[in-house]
């Protein structure tokens, strides 16, 4: 694989990781990502909630969790409480309803700080990928000096593109958090 293609793949992976991280930030709207990674102790082992139940959005402020096995309702409720997500599960027979509370201004400010920190971490990761690629280029004795400069320019363009995408995602998420 060429250095350029490898670099782009690593940067795309960093971007995907960032997307997954910020998806879990609570904006006050119900979204399955809020709870799908919660771990639940069932069958003598620990499993992710998304493997034990279907998670759907009833309305903008409510999630509905339908366990595949109705015997797991109490274990799922305990897992959600233990995850410290500030969510209160309400078991109604074989389903669990979770009302998403309105975030406070203090909570929003804290989440925005976390968002900015995660955004900067993602950009640092992308810049580290750029540095590694540039180091590989310089060590490659088959390339001429002009070819190295051209590749470095393309790598910088990739870096700028991915950093810009991170900034745009951060601004969008920050707007979502601020408009609640």
UniProtKB/Swiss-Prot annotation:
Its main location: cytoplasm. It comes from the Bacteria. InterPro entries: Ribosome_recyc_fac, Ribosome_recyc_fac_dom, RRF_sf. Keywords: Cytoplasm, Protein biosynthesis. It is found in: Cytoplasm. One of its GO terms (molecular function) is ribosomal large subunit binding. One of its GO terms (cellular component) is cytoplasm. GO terms for biological process: translational termination. NCBIfam families: frr. Responsible for the release of ribosomes from messenger RNA at the termination of protein biosynthesis. May increase the efficiency of translation by recycling ribosomes from one round of translation to another. Belongs to the RRF family. This is Ribosome-recycling factor. It comes from Chlamydia felis (strain Fe/C-56).
């Amino acid at each position: 694989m060429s250095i350029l293609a490898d670099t782009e793949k690593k940067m795309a992976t960093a971007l995907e990781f960032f997307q997954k991280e910020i998806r879990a930030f609570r904006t006050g709207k119900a979204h399955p990502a809020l709870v799908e990674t919660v771990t639940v102790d069932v069958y003598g082992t620990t499993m992710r909630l998304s493997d034990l139940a279907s998670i759907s959005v009833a309305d903008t402020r409510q999630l509905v969790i339908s366990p595949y096995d109705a015997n797991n309702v109490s274990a799922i409720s305990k897992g959600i409480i233990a995850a410290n997500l500030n969510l209160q599960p309400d078991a109604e027979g074989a389903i669990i309803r979770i009302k998403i509370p309105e975030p406070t201004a203090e909570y929003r400010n804290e989440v925005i700080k976390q968002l900015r920190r995660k955004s900067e971490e993602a950009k640092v990761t992308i810049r580290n990928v750029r540095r590694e690629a540039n180091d590989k280029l310089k060590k490659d004795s088959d390339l001429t000096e002009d070819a190295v400069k051209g590749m470095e320019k393309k790598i910088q363009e990739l870096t700028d593109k991915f950093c810009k995408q991170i900034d745009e995602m951060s601004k969008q998420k920050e707007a979502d958090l601020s408009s609640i």
